[in-house]
C-alpha cells in the first residue's frame, strides 16, 4: 500500500470534489505508531487514504470523519493508551495521541492541498502549515498552506562574483551543513499573529537511481516501490532495463556518457550495478559532480578499486555516503537479500543523515 503523502494526494486529486475529511496527529505523549504530523484522508463513502495507527484507531476515526463532514465542524480527538485498564481501542503502544479532524471545503480552500500536491509532484520540499482551530469551530475558518524551504537539498553551488570559488572540500562541507539543517526539521507548533499552527515538514518521495537493469536489479526496484520511493533505472543496453521487468520504475536509455548532470541531481540515492567495469566507471563519473546523499557500488573491494582506477576517482571525491561493497552485512546471497541489505543501509543513511561509515552504528538501535 502507498502511504507517502504524495500518494495520498494523487488519489485525492482524482476526486477532489467529494466531501473529504483530513485527519492529522497534532501531538503525541509517550509511544505511538505514527508521530505528530502524520496525515490521513477520508471520503464520504468511508474510503481511507493513509493510516494514523497500526489499524486500531481507523474504524473509530472513520466515524468521526463522517460526523465532521456532515456538520462541517472541526473535531479534536484524544486516544489515551496510558490507562492499562482502558481497553476501548486495544491500543498496544501505551501512548496518548491527539488528532484533529477537519472537513475539506471550498471555504477553507481545501486546506491548501491542491498547492501542496503540485509542489510535491514537482519534487519540492518545505512545510505544510495548518491552523489549529478550536474543537467544534466551523471548518471554513481553517487554513492550510505550503511553505517552500529556503534552501533546496540539491541546489548547485554557484559562487557569486564577490565570493571565492568553492573548492571540492568546501562544497562538501556546505552540503553536509544543509543536510544537517534538513534533518533537524520536525513537526512543531508555531504561533503567528496570535494563531497556533502545526508546521509539518513535507518532501517528495525519495528518488532512487539504479544504474544497471539486470535481473538482480528487479528486487531492488520492487522493494523501493514498496517504500513508496520514486525509481529510475538507467541502462542503454537493449537487452536490459525492459519496462515490463520494472513496472514501478521510469526507464532511462540514455548512454551514461551523455547523461546531463541535471538528470541526476534530483536523485537522493544511486546504486551502481551494471556488472560491467566500463559502465560502472561511466556511472561513477556521471554521479561524482552531484550532491547525492547515498551512492553504492555493487561488488567486492578489489573490484571497487578497479572501477575507481578506471574512473580516476576515490571515495573522497563524493560528497555523500559512499558504500562499496554495497549494503549492510545482513547475510544471504540471493538478489532479494542483496537488495534488502542495500536498501536497509540506504534507508538508514537517508533518514538519519549519516555522512560516513563510522556513523553506521547509529543504525544499530531499537526504534523509539
Residues covered by each model-derived region:
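Adenosine-phosphate binding glycine-rich loop
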Residues: 297-368
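Conserved SAM-binding strand-loop segment of SAM-dependent methyltransferases
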Residues: 249-254
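Segments forming oxygen-rich coordination pockets for charged ligands
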Residues: 1-236, 240-247, 265-269, 310, ...
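Short, structured coil segments at secondary-structure junctions
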Residues: 246-247, 290-291, 314, 318
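ADP-ribose/adenylate-binding Rossmann-like module
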Residues: 269, 274-277, 281, 285-310
Amino acid at each position: 500500500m502507498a502511504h507517502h503523502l504524495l500518494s495520498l494526494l494523487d488519489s485525492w486529486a482524482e476526486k477532489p470534489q467529494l466531501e473529504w475529511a483530513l485527519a492529522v496527529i497534532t501531538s503525541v505523549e509517550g509511544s505511538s505508531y505514527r508521530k505528530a504530523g502524520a496525515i490521513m484522508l477520508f471520503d464520504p463513502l468511508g474510503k481511507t487514504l493513509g493510516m494514523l495507527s497500526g489499524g486500531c484507531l481507523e474504524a473509530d476515526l472513520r466515524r468521526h470523519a463522517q460526523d465532521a463532514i456532515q456538520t462541517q465542524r472541526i473535531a479534536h480527538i484524544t486516544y489515551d493508551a496510558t490507562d492499562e485498564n482502558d481497553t476501548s481501542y486495544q491500543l498496544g503502544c501505551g501512548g496518548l495521541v491527539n488528532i484533529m479532524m477537519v472537513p475539506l471545503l471550498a471555504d477553507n480552500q481545501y486546506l491548501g492541498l491542491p498547492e501542496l500536491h503540485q509542489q510535491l509532484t514537482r519534487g519540492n520540499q518545505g512545510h505544510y502549515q495548518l491552523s489549529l482551530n478550536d474543537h467544534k469551530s466551523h471548518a471554513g475558518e481553517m487554513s492550510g498552506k505550503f511553505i517552500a524551504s529556503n534552501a533546496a537539498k540539491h541546489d548547485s553551488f554557484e559562487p557569486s562574483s564577490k565570493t571565492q570559488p568553492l573548492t571540492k572540500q568546501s562544497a562538501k562541507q556546505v552540503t553536509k551543513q544543509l543536510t544537517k539543517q534538513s534533518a533537524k526539521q520536525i513537526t512543531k507548533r508555531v504561533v503567528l499573529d496570535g494563531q497556533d499552527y502545526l508546521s509539518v515538514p513535507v518532501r517528495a518521495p525519495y528518488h532512487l537511481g539504479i544504474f544497471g537493469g539486470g535481473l538482480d536489479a528487479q528486487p531492488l526496484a520492487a522493494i523501493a516501490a514498496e517504500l513508496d520511493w520514486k525509481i529510475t533505472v538507467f541502462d542503454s543496453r537493449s537487452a536490459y532495463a525492459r519496462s515490463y521487468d520494472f513496472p514501478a520504475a521510469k526507464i532511462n536509455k540514455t548512454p551514461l556518457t551523455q547523461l546531463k548532470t541535471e538528470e541526476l541531481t534530483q536523485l537522493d540515492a544511486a546504486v551502481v550495478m551494471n556488472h560491467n567495469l566500463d559502465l560502472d566507471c561511466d556511472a561513477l563519473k556521471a554521479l561524482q559532480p552531484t550532491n547525492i546523499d547515498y551512492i553504492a557500488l555493487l561488488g567486492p573491494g578489489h573490484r571497487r578499486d578497479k572501477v575507481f582506477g578506471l574512473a580516476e576517482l576515490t571515495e573522497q571525491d563524493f560528497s555523500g555516503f559512499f558504500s562499496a561493497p554495497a549494503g549492510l552485512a545482513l547475510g544471504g546471497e540471493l538478489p532479494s537479500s542483496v537488495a534488502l541489505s542495500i536498501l536497509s543501509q540506504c534507508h538508514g543513511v537517508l533518514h538519519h543523515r549519516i555522512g560516513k561509515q563510522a556513523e553506521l552504528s547509529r543504525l544499530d538501535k531499537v526504534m523509539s
